[in-house]
C-alpha cells in the first residue's frame, strides 16, 4: 500500500521540463491549469530533497562553526589561566570558601615547626571581638562586644625561640578584649604553665649502685637525693599519657625565652596558657625532638645526597693528584740517581777524571743550594717536604677539578652548611637530652667526609691564627725596638 501511494505521489509531481513542454504545446485559449493536489508527505519529501552540493556546503559550515566554537573555548581557557597566574585572587571560584563542609572545631593548641627557625603557635581562642552598632558614639566609632566562638577559629602566631614569653603574651593580649575590674577596663594577664619535673626516677646510674640496691643496701652518697634533679625525655606530645591528678603545674616567668620554656615543657605532653579574667585555659601540645628538627634533618638529607655525589668526584681527583705528586717525587730521585751515575762514569771511566768533575760537581751543588734559597725567599714559607707536596698536589687538584667539572666553591658552601645544620641539631638534642644518631640521616660515608673537612678547616684556621700571632709578635718587637732607639737618640741629644 505504501509503495502504491509513493508511486502516485511521484506521478502527481511532474518535473519542470515536462510542465514547460506541456504548456507550450497546449493552446492558450483553451488553457486551463488545474493545480494538482499534492499530499503533505510529498511536500515534505520535496523540501528535504537537496542536491549533494548543497549538503556538502551545509556540512562544511557546521564543521567550521564547531571548530570556531572549540577554538574560542580554548582561547578563553588559556586567557583564564594567564589571568590566574598574573592575579591569583581572580581564580575561578574565588568567591567560594576553600573548604566546603563543617570542620571539627579545634579544642587544643599546637606548637608547630616551620622550614625556618620560627615556630608556629596555634591557639584556639574561645573569644572574639565584634563591632556593635548600638554602642556607636558621636565619633562614628563602633563599640566592641564580647561573644563566645561557637566555631573556634584558631589564632596563628610566629615566634622565634629566642624571644621571651612576654612577647607572646603581648601578641595574645592584642587579640583579646579588655576585662572590667572595679569599673575600669584592664588588659588581661596571660600566664604560661608547664608540668613540673618528676622527683627523680630513682634509677641506678652505676653497677655498684645497682648491685647495692639489689642487695638491699643504701645507694651511693652521690645519689642519695634525686629530688633536685629534673628529668628530661624530649618526647613531647609523643610521650606517655598521665592523668590530671599526677600532673603538677608550674608558672613560668614572662622573661623566659621561648626555646628554654619549650625545652622544659617537652618533658610532658603539653603546656597550658591561662587568661586572667575569663577563666580560660588553653592546652598546647609540645613538639618532640623529631618534630622540632624535622625540616633541619630533611635539609641535611638533601645536602647529604648532593655531597655524596660530589665527594666521589673529589676523591677521584685527589687520588690522581697525589699519585702525580708521588710520581714527581720519584722522578726527582731518578734525576739525582742519574746525576750520580754520570759523575761516576765520567770520573772513573773516561780520560777527564776527577780533575774536571770536581769543580763541576761543586758548582752544580752550589747552584742547587742558591736556587732553593731563592725559592724559600720567594714563597716565604717553611721549606719542607710536606709544604712542597702540598703545593704540587693543590695545583694538580685544581687542574683536575676544572677537567671534571667540580665546583670547589659549591663544595665548600655545602660542607659548611651541612656542618652548621649538624651543630644546630646537636644543640637541640642536648636541650632535649636525646642521643641523635646522625648516621641515619647523613650516612656513614658522608659523616666521615664532613668530619674530615671540618678537621681540615679547623687545622687551616689554627695555622692562619698562628701566622697572625707570629706576625703580631714580630710587629710588636719591631715597634719596641724603634721606641727604644728613639729614646736612646733623644737621651744622647
From Swiss-Prot:
Protein name (Swiss-Prot/TrEMBL): Calcium uniporter protein, mitochondrial
Assembly mode: Homotetramer, assembles in a dimer or dimers configuration with two interfaces.
Topology Mitochondrial intermembrane: residue spans: 349-355
Residues binding Ca(2+), per UniProt: 358
Record's keyword terms, sorted: Calcium, Calcium channel, Calcium transport, Coiled coil, Ion channel, Ion transport, Membrane, Metal-binding, Mitochondrion, Mitochondrion inner membrane, Transit peptide, Transmembrane, Transmembrane helix, Transport
An example molecular function term from Gene Ontology annotations: identical protein binding
Transmembrane segments: 327-348, 356-378
Family membership: Belongs to the MCU (TC 1.A.77) family.
InterPro entries: MCU_C, MCU_fam
Localization: Mitochondrion inner membrane
